[in-house]
Amino acid sequence: MWTGSNSKDLKVLNRLLVRDMIRRLGPIARYEIAKETGLTPSTVTVIVAELLEAGVIKEVGHGASSGGRRPILLELNPTAAYVFAIRIQRGELMTAIFDLDKNIMAQRYSHLDTDLPDNVVEMIGSSFEELIEETRMNPDAILWCGVACPGLVSSHRGVVERSSNLGWIKVPLSALISKRLGGLPVHVENISNAAALAEKEYGLGRGHKHLVFINLSVGIGAGILADGEIYGGVKGFAGEIGHMTLLTENGPLCACGRRGCFEAVCGVRAVVERAKATIPAETFAEYGISKDELTLADLAFSPLANCTEAQRLIGEVGRFIGILVANVVNLLNPETIILGGELSNLGDRLLQAVKAEVEARTLEEIQKTVSIQISNIKGSAPLMGAYALALERIFSLEEWDGQRVQANWEYQISG
């Protein structure tokens, strides 16, 4: 149970405790809150009355009787506040407004030039305004913005220190987005870390304290949860497994400037380019697919995926990714590995190739305790993670009543 250094601190902590209990366990009765928290029934009654008056929670009928009157049940009011969530990826932007119960009120998906941060920030602002207009929502009801972005992210400073795939160096992204959105608080996290958090909260990672989400996209990265918390290393940059070396001689050039990285061999762009180079022109013609316009989706979902060359390529990519996963398993000894990102759409063919390599390359004692699965989160795991990060921050606030948080912003445009 939380404690405070004085009565004011204790009152605030008790309020946070009750609010979080209702959020996580609702519908729940007042007496159950008192039992779970150790607070007196009178304290719970006062706090609940305050939360009801603020519109943060609501009464939702009656529970079962244990002999007396049936207790009134409480749950979080999902429309008490909203979150603006963003996923940035090379050439793509995904934005959405969520309520407090992870329902998407409206969303946008855009293709754009992501080389210039100002272009991305402006598109974020335009998307925000379009979503507000579509939902007819008061923008002040949106309390926080969460952003999932590829690269080395100093989340405590809101700065993208380096993103090889975006071509960004030292971009104060939190401050730039906050300014464009009229002062809305913004939290930026690495895209793989965000996805790992989404898996912990909403996906296959529920109930697991030690998991690794491997994002198989344009870039390749890992979000690592150790004892239930994101593990970032000394500066928060842990998980850049796409820049581990696969080929030491004459490897392809990576966006980071080095040769032979896993990402340069197994990233989405690399796989598509290898498919263009290895699948014969007559095969493209046979399946009615333009070689120049080939996408990963063609290799995952179209009949082209069944041609001999595509099958061989997918098997090889699966083996390489399996080597990468085996290294992660031997190094971190996680409970579960979750594969996500566009390459995971290759499905069971990819998964079986990965599992075969892990079985061949990991120590038996470590191997037998790990599960390897493809993410089952509908939509975008990084977007859901951006939402979860923002939600965490909303529920750490001492007070809120559905109006814009007046935060003391530490992020500055100067970085």
Describe each PLM feature range.
Residues 104-210, 349-360:
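Glycine-rich phosphate-binding loop and adjoining helix at the ATP-binding site
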